[in-house]
């Protein structure tokens, strides 16, 4: 397993959870972003900076994916591509994207996008709260525990 983080929009508090988890579980993790960011010194954590542009980071993640890799993203199309390529996708609120729920998520995203383009103010997601952080940490821990048992 390799953890791929869509790091441009990933909240700092989630990155901190990921840094600790990668180190503890001894799992390779790469943050992919189009701007520089600080990462802790660790043999398990890497940073890949890509050029600016629409979906450049997403495309780079998809290109490098292997079966059973884990992708951390709130980007539903990236999550769908990851799942299609045999990876696991988890969003920063701790929700696991699956083959069963990704189609509905894509449809809702497209519907909201069409509302926004017609001038409707749909607002954004609520701020990340403690419950979201805990759900993320719990699901990440479950996935890493399952991976450790399979090694």
Swiss-Prot record:
Xref: Pfam families: DUF188
Region Disordered: start-end pairs: 116-135
InterPro entries associated with the record: UPF0178
Family from the record: Belongs to the UPF0178 family.
Protein name according to UniProt: UPF0178 protein Tcr_1995
């Amino acid at each position: 397993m390799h953890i791929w983080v869509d790091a441009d929009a990933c909240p700092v508090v989630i990155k901190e959870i990921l840094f600790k988890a990668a180190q503890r579980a001894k799992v390779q993790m790469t943050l992919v972003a189009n701007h520089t960011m600080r990462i802790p010194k660790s043999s398990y954590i890497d940073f890949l900076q890509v050029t600016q542009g629409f979906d450049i980071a997403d495309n780079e993640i998809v290109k490098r994916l292997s079966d059973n890799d884990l992708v951390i993203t709130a980007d539903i199309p990236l999550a769908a591509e990851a799942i299609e390529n045999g990876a696991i996708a988890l969003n920063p609120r701790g929700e696991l994207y699956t083959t069963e729920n990704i189609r509905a998520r894509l449809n809702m995203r497209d519907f909201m996008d069409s509302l926004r383009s017609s001038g409707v103010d749909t607002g954004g997601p609520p701020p990340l709260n403690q419950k979201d952080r805990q759900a993320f940490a719990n699901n990440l821990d479950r996935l890493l525990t399952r991976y450790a048992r399979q090694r």
